[in-house]
Amino acid sequence: MKSVLPLLAVLLIVTVGCGGARPYRAMARAATSEENVFAQAQDKELKVQLREALLARGESPLAITPYVYMGRGFVVGFVGDGAQRDGVLSAAQGVQGLRSLQSYLPDRPTTSSTANDVATKANVKAALVPHPEIGVTHVDIEVLGGHVVLLGVVGSEEARESAVTAVAAVSGVKGVTNFLLLPEPGYESQRPHLR
């Protein structure tokens, strides 16, 4: 036991010295995003505020997922009934700084579809990989009862259409809601992308 502690200490020092644990996926996603870095930072801040507004209302952080792109807010998840849906939307609309708000909030089904939804999500990601114009790392995917919700910022109208076509062809997909956005003036990235 005594010889293990110095070894662990050395390992810790080496790990920290090599940069430590970094969120490499998030770093790569930010560097190749269609949004500029300032818009990404503002979106992160608005997303936190949106999540806090939902939590203050008593919503489970696992039931409703907030997203923000170019100042536009989205809330996605199952709700128990119309009253909960109205409450979620009311809380989200109270967030200052959001330019708009859209939602996909279907009623929770009586039977769980979680296992099928996880498998469908994996298949949807796999279907998007062969389309470099989409940039699968820039598309957030939610699957609710077999219905796929696509969110994010893509580089062209062709990429938006390709994403919907590819996803609709996946086995198990019952429908597609396309919340993919194109870069708007003032929000677009200022550097060329290598993909």
Question: Which positions does each model-derived feature cover?
Answer:
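N-terminal targeting leaders
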Residues: K2-L7, L12-R195
